[in-house]
């Protein structure tokens, strides 16, 4: 009507239309794959010799903390020795922008794994000041955690590329 000059201006010009964009949902780890990963890691833990047991305990503890807290890989890597209370299960995390927050682990079997890890690595933990340490007695870095996760998912026969952040999304659902 506007083009043929029957009306001066189309009334539709005053209507504002918003189209809702499709939102991609975050990727989560299916329960079966989490169970498969943890079962594999616990099996490896039971089969390891004493020398590698302390690092296997660390890896199991890291994965359990991921799933129990929904923490970011940066937050787990930077847990200080004095930021975790193994009796109460309270952990102080330093998040984005230096924001401090507390998370609670109430699962007693996870706390037992954390206590065993601490008992076998106490000297290295105290030396570094960080709760999760590498074989050189320093902080277990974010990149090392990512590589560890990749290694165990492959060993467990999981084809999906599982990232640390996927634990965060899985925790929230």
Cite the ranges covered by each PLM segment.
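Conserved catalytic core of the tyrosine transesterase superfamily
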Residues: 1-173
């Amino acid at each position: 009507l506007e083009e043929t000059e029957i009306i001066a201006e189309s009334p539709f010009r005053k209507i504002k239309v918003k189209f809702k964009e499709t939102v991609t949902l975050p990727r989560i780890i299916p329960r079966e794959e989490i169970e498969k990963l943890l079962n594999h890691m616990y099996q490896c833990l039971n089969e390891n010799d004493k020398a590698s047991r302390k690092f296997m305990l660390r890896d199991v503890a890291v994965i359990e903390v991921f799933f129990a807290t929904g923490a970011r890989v940066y937050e787990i890597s930077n847990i200080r020795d004095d930021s975790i209370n193994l009796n109460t299960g309270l952990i102080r995390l330093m998040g984005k922008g230096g924001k401090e927050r507390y998370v609670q682990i109430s699962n007693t079997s996870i706390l037992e794994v954390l206590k065993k890890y601490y008992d076998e690595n106490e000297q290295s933990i105290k030396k570094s000041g960080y709760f999760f340490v590498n074989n050189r007695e320093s902080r277990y870095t974010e990149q090392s955690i990512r590589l560890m996760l990749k290694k165990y998912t492959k060993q467990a026969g999981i084809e999906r590329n599982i990232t640390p952040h996927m634990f965060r999304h899985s925790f929230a659902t």
